[in-house]
């Protein structure tokens, strides 16, 4: 899987997603507190970060532990589980709309993305 270059806004958005999801892996629903172990909990993008239009889309991202992000849901049959989870979370119509957004093009705009992410963080603080 091709990974997009990490930017400062990626770090900000990742922190927002993990805070929104209360620092828990949504796949295994463990109540383990990852707030002191940021490396153990990842911001997983259903559609890759290389797709600029959904890179900072809150419906495209969830918190996953290292296992589910790198081994469980990211590969083979696990991808089917990830898809089923996303459809359940967003509904079929919401998932289909996310799919459409993922296939549109968007020019990178870090300044605008940073403003939008700061506004999102206000909602969870």
What role is predicted for each listed range?
Residues 8-42, 65-68:
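Short cysteine-rich loop/turn motifs with clustered Cys
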Residues 25, 51-72:
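Short beta-strand-alpha-helix junction that forms the catalytic/metal-binding core
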Residues 32, 47-50:
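Short, well-ordered turn and helix-capping elements at secondary-structure junctions
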Residues 35-46, 73-79:
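Short Cys/His-rich "knuckle" micro-motifs
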